[in-house]
Every structure is written in C-alpha cells, then in structure tokens.
Amino acid sequence: MKTWLFFTFLFSCSSFYASCRYAEVRSIHEVAGDILYDEENFWLILDLDDTLLQGGEALSHSIWKSKAIQGLQKQGTPEQEAWEAVVPFWIEIQEMGTVQPIESAIFLLIEKIQKQGKTTFVYTERPKTAKDLTLKQLHMLNVSLEDTAPQPQAPLPKNLLYTSGILFSGDYHKGPGLDLFLEICTPLPAKIIYIDNQKENVLRIGDLCQKYGIAYFGITYKAQELHPPIYFDNIAQVQYNYSKKLLSNEAAALLLRHQMHE
C-alpha cells in the first residue's frame, strides 16, 4: 500500500453521474501520480495563499490577516466589513514583505501538467486590487499560468478579475467567484481537480462541481504544517508598530528583546 494512503481520506459520491473524491495530504507527492496520470479532460485549479506561497514575515502572513478579521468580528463588526477593513492593509504589508514557496514540488507538478496541455489556473480570495502584487509574487517563484488558463466566453461581474491565469474573487469564503466564472465558460471540463489548504473551501468547490455535474477531486493540502512557523503574535505586534518599513522576523525579535531589557 502506498505511503500516502496513511495520510489521505478518500471517498466517492455521485451527482449527475459525476464522481467525487477527496484527499488530505501533507505533500503534493502523495497525489502527484493520481493527477499526472489522470486521463480525463480536467482543469487543475489551485488556491494561492498557504497553498502555493506564504508571507515571509509574521505581519505579512495570512494568519495575521485571519486573526485581525476575527478580532474585529469579536468586537461586533460584520464578517464582510471586517474583511474589507483588514485586507487592504494586509496587501500593503505584502508589498513590503517577502514571499516563500510552500513546497517546491507543487511547481514542478504545475509545469508537468502544463506540458500535457491541461488547463491550469489559480483561484484566490484576494481582491482584484492585489493583481500587480500577485503577479510579482508568482514571477518571483517562476510560475506562469497564462498559456494554459481557460478563456471565459463573456465578461465577468465587476467585482471579479481574471487575468494571466488568476481569478481574483474578493470572496471571504470560496465558491461564489468560481460559480460565476463557470457560468460563462464553454465548454466546461469533465473534471476539476482543486487544491487548497482549507478543507471547508475544498468541500465548497466539491458542492459547486456537483451543481454542474462535473467530476471532482478535492485535495486539502497541509504541506505548510511541515514548515517552521512564521507567524508569532508578539513579532507581528512589533512589526505592526513599525509598519512604515516592515521589519523581518529576526529584526523584530531583536527589537522585542531590547524592549524587554529596558
């Protein structure tokens, strides 16, 4: 039995005669063969933050963004308002920060799938205002999706942006943006393979595929858990206090130690 079976949870379902399969993995190696040797006409769709890349500082990391949104919600701010308040600042911090890949093997997988001529693109909850930042970050990681991305047959709603193989939805929860995208794509794929670090997103896209009668392989991707942590509350606070010029985690830690000894 393959090693990856110990780390995956698989099951099948049917809706409109479309198969549905789920897996949870800690390395893309665990499902790479299933994807590479899948003979169906599939689209490979990938999440961005914490799936392909992550911020290199505590304040630029998505964990800070999530905690800030949750903090506002605890104070009574509605979810969408909290999202709209936090994300623009987080994007500004990302502009000043560094970016790290989650797992180099996933980029090799993307390259091999593209060489097969299979459709590949990114679906991110980032707003369309993050276009330039996102393209720069992917360029730094030598990722290009434009040549193998699908081409919609009609204009998207104004809240969405699709460019260079990246669908920017501005969704706090995944699903609605891709739904609108699928509505204007012809023909639809026989199958969608979706990779995201959040299980709830993987399940939502599975429900969406059932709606369209599209076969589905949803992969909850936990490779980030194998990395040393980047986010620390106290480091993020120091970086926030000096956010006009984003400090590295190391510089923030030195400053924090100095403050503690004063």
UniProtKB/Swiss-Prot annotation:
Topology in membrane: Peripheral membrane protein
InterPro entries according to UniProt: DUF2608, HAD-like_sf
Signal peptide: 1-17
Keyword tags: Cell outer membrane, Membrane, Signal
Pfam families, alphabetized: DUF2608
Compartments, as annotated in UniProt: Cell outer membrane
Gene Ontology cellular-component annotations: cell outer membrane
Name this polypeptide is given: Putative outer membrane protein CPn_1034/CP_0818/CPj1034/CpB1074
